[in-house]
Amino acid sequence: MLAIRKGSATKGVAMYEIEEPEVPEGWALVKVLKASICGTDVHIYQWNEWSQKRMKPPVTIGHEFVGKVLKVNKGTGRVQEGDIVSAESHVVCHVCRMCRRNMYHACENTRIIGVHMDGAFAEYIAIPEENLVKLPGSVPLEAGSVLEPFGNAVHTVQSVDVRGKRVVVTGVGPIGVMAIPVAKALGAVEIIATDLSDYRLKLASDVGADVVINVKEQDPVQIVQDLGGADVVLEMSGSEKALNQGLEMIVPGGEMAILGLPDNRVSLDLANNVVSKGITIRGITGRRLWETWDLGVSLVSSGKVDLKKVITHQFDFKDYEAAFSAMMSGNSGKVVLNVSQ
């Protein structure tokens, strides 16, 4: 089969012809139909410090996909041959203290598909059956391919109370953009998006942002404060400046959820912007298993969230270099590879 792999500890990836994967007991074989490129895949492509610490090539990359189940080896009946599925990319241990506290998303021994084990940028993938999520027919294949990162957006919004609130999303990359219709669907009355890119702000507006602010041209703190302040801030950028601006915007007693990962340590005015204002801050990782998936699939299958608006580029599987270029250009939403029919 064809697979896009990190063949060696250098920049770039390549397509290889490799054997189809074996299917251990309790695992399933899935034919990959569509797969989307994540920021993690870009890190691996660029072979930055994050990927060098976590990956030992050769590994087939990719962890966001939709596919068809071809075989289940002594499974539980969770999925059947022929089912259309997406998948949770974190393979958990079930025995660490986090798993035993029903916090599987924070498993201390997590292995990530496409990082620690062969992933989904291949014609076929072997994956634990328990990680598969059966999709109803009302979920388009394109949407199915981005449900995993959509889950990050859902988890972030779920972690705070947006009902009847003014919500600011700082950083509207693909996951920040996806958080906007989720917040809208869960009851936010006004959503403000901030970013450096007019392209991304246009995408944010298209999916439901009421106000968009290019922080290179306008003062987001002043604008939001003039509107009455932010009840909730979703920090999706990883920018120290955006994080501090978000804290300045929040009204006393407000909430912030942080999904964006800064490259380095950050400096905050805790005394004035957090403690004195009584702000609650939550760090977000992964997706809660399985509440996040249940809500995410429901939002898409019911039509409350249209993920096709977030998918801006699609490429043939063999045109993966062009797909990575589009993803790294900064002028894209989600980029999808059409792997097979």
Question: What kind of feature is each model-predicted range?
Answer:
Residues A3-E22, G39-K71, S86, A106-H116:
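N-terminal glycine-rich cofactor-binding segment
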Residues P21-A35, W50-R97, P136-S138:
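Glycine-rich beta-strand-centered segment in the early N-terminal region that forms part
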Residues C93-T170:
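NAD(P)H dinucleotide-binding glycine-rich loop of Rossmann-like/cofactor-binding domains
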